[in-house]
Amino acid sequence: MSTTLVVDTSVVFGALDAGDPDHASCSETVSAGAALVLPAPVVVELDWIARSRGTLDATSALVNGLLDGSMLVVNLELEDYARAIELVEKYADLPLDLVDASVIAIAERLEQDTIATLDRRHFSVVRPSHIDAFTLVP
C-alpha cells in the first residue's frame, strides 16, 4: 500500500460506525499506517449519511480524527472541479456523482494508484488519467 491513501466516504463511514457490516475491513484499512487523505466533499457526504442513519457519533469521530491529525482533508482546486465534471459527464451512465468524481480527481492530482472504497461499481469502471486502473481496498 502507498504511504498516502485517498479515502472514499464508504470506507470512512464503515470504519467509524461499529454497526456497519464492513466495519472490520474498513477499520483495518484506515489503521494500516498510510496517511489518510479525504477530499473535502467526502466530509460533507459523511455527515449527511451519518445524520440520515441517526449515527452522529460517526461525524464526531471524523471531526476528532481531523483535529488529531489522523486524517487530512484536501480541498478541491479549480482543475479538480474541472476534472470531476469531466468524469461525471463521461461516466453519466453509471451515474458517477460529484463526490466520487472528486475522490478520483484528487487521487489523480496526488498521483495515487490506490483508493479506499467499498464502491466497486463506480471506481472499478473509471479509467484514471495517470494509470490504467486504480487498486481498490479493502
Go through each PLM region and give its residues.
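Alpha-helix/helix-capping structural signal
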Residues: 10-11, 41, 79, 121
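Active-site neighborhoods of divalent-metal-dependent phosphate/nucleic-acid chemistry enzymes
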Residues: 72-118
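Acidic, PIN/NYN-like endoribonuclease modules and their adjacent C-terminal/linker elements
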Residues: 2-4, 104, 108-138
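Short, well-structured N-terminal submotif of metal-dependent ribonuclease cores
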Residues: 1-38, 51-64, 129-130
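Nucleotide phosphate-binding site architecture
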Residues: 13, 44, 124
